[in-house]
Amino acid sequence: GPAPLDRILVRDRGRIFPLAVHEIEYMKADSKYTVISARGQHFLVRIGMSELEAQLDPRRFIRVHRSALVNLDFVESMRADDQSQLQIFMRDGTCIGANREASRLLREMAI
């Protein structure tokens, strides 16, 4: 397939600027929009998360549940909860719960 995207153009309050994909920390789906967290800011973009995900490197960006995608480069640590599903702690302090499928995938990736 095509090479993963390395840059996107985001609009924010009337300005448009390039955002390098490696700066994206995580993203969350919000109906037809996606909230992208990067550089300590949150950007609301008018594109569905699945559409964006299809253009990203799957070794770096992991879909942890239906409405969240994380960049492993910005994960501080992960810890299993009582249901043995992983809680993902991001470097900015955000905690995102991984579903069973993602928890299994992440465990398999661990060496």
Regions found by a protein language model. Name each.
Residues 1-111:
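Basic, polyanion-interacting recognition surfaces, primarily
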